Amino acid sequence: SPIVELGSERAAMAAFVGTVFLHGGALIYSSQEIGHEAPINFFAYTSVDWSECSDIYQEYGCLMGLYNKYPALRKGILTGYPASDVLMYQKSDGKDAFMILVNVRNRDVSVILPEGWKHHVATDIYENKPLELMNEIKLNALEYRIIRF
């Protein structure tokens, strides 16, 4: 399970967000979307309580909804931006531009935004809220942001 492998639900979710929008198909492994920690035997029936972690299930559902809604997130041109504590990349398709930021550390960090993203009003599409971008953005431990410009 990603939760066991990465040490926490938040670390597993950060890893999922960091990789799902990179390029290609979204991979969700058996019961990952409910935070099921025990191994699943693929050759035998395993009962899974789908109400086990409804908040995680809803978070995966929202993220996959965004993945399906915006072609740029699935198939857009990928532009990476190096940062030591944050996985940061842009996905764009000529219609929409998105910045995906994932704090990969178990501590709060700040990251300087790329020039084209500074001093603009954008939208945090996961939270569905306007976001005023300055020179840098602060991310809590293992927090992610999906920003539409």
Predicted regions and their residues:
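Carbohydrate-interacting/catalytic domains
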Residues: E9-M13, H23-I28, Q32-F149
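Active-site clefts of carbohydrate-active enzymes
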Residues: S1-G7
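Conserved glycine-rich, hydrophobic/aromatic-active-site segments
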Residues: F16
